[in-house]
Amino acid sequence: MPAIALVAAGARLGLSLGKTFGARGFEVALIARSRERLDDLTGKLGAAGVTAAGFPADVADRPALAAALDSAAGRFGRIDVLHYSAPAAGSGETARGTGTLEVTVDNLQPQMESICYGAVTATRAVLPAMLAAGTGTLLYTTGASSVTPVPVFASAGMAGAALRRWILALNKALADKGIYAGHVAIGTWIAGTPGAPEGVSPKEPDDIARLYWDLHASRERAEHLISA
C-alpha cells in the first residue's frame, strides 16, 4: 500500500489529511513532537479504518526529524507522499512571528528553523527514494503571509516566503522526474482552532484536506491559496 507522511501532524488538518488519504488506500505515518498527540491521532485514524503509526520528532531537530522519516519509510516500505505543515516557532501570539520593525536575526532564526529548514530536512529524507522510483508527491502548507505580506507576522512570513519560493522551484525541477511538488497557503481559520475572531466563518478541515488530495491526484497546479 502507498504511504503518506504527515510532518507536524495536528488534530485538525493533520487528522483530516490522514482520513482523506487513508480512505483512498494510503497508510499514514504521523510525525509530531508529542507522543500523546501521536497516540491520539493513530487511535482516531485506526477507528476510521486507517493504518497509522506515530514517530516522535521536533521539526527543529534536524537529525531527529530525518531519523523519524527513515523509521517511517522502514515501517511502511517507502514514503509516497510527504506533507509538511510548516509550524511557526513559539506558542500563542509568539507563534505568529515578529512584527516588521522588530525583526532581528535572533528572532528570525527560530522561524527559519521550524518553517523552512524543517521542510528542507524532511524533503531530503524522502526525495532520494522518490527519485529512484520515478514517482512521488511533496505537499507543503504555510500561512498566507508567505504569499501576501502581513506586517505583524513578518518573521514567520519571511520564512514561509523563502519556503514557498523553493517549493515552486521544486515543482519545476522535478516535473520531468515523475515527482509533483505543491504549496498550499492557508489564509483562513480552520474549524476547531481556538480563538477564531468574531464574524469569521472557519473552513472545515475535511474540506481543506480534499483539496490536497486533488492537488496530489491532478498535479495541475503548483500552488493554491485558501482565503477567508
Regions found by a protein language model. Give the residues of each.
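Canonical Rossmann dinucleotide-binding motif of NAD(H)/NADP(H)-dependent dehydrogenases/reductases
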Residues: 1-29
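Rossmann-fold scaffold of SDR-type NAD(P)-dependent oxidoreductases
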Residues: 7, 79-93, 115, 140, ...
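Conserved glycine-rich Rossmann-like NAD(P)H-binding loop of the short-chain dehydrogenase/reductase
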Residues: 26-40
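Rossmann-fold cofactor-recognition segment
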Residues: 45-63
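Hydrophobic positions on the long internal alpha-helix
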Residues: 68, 83, 111, 118, ...
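Conserved mid-core segment of classical short-chain dehydrogenase/reductases
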Residues: 87-106
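Catalytic loop of short-chain dehydrogenase/reductase
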Residues: 88, 105-107, 111, 115, ...
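C-terminal helical subdomain
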Residues: 168, 176-228
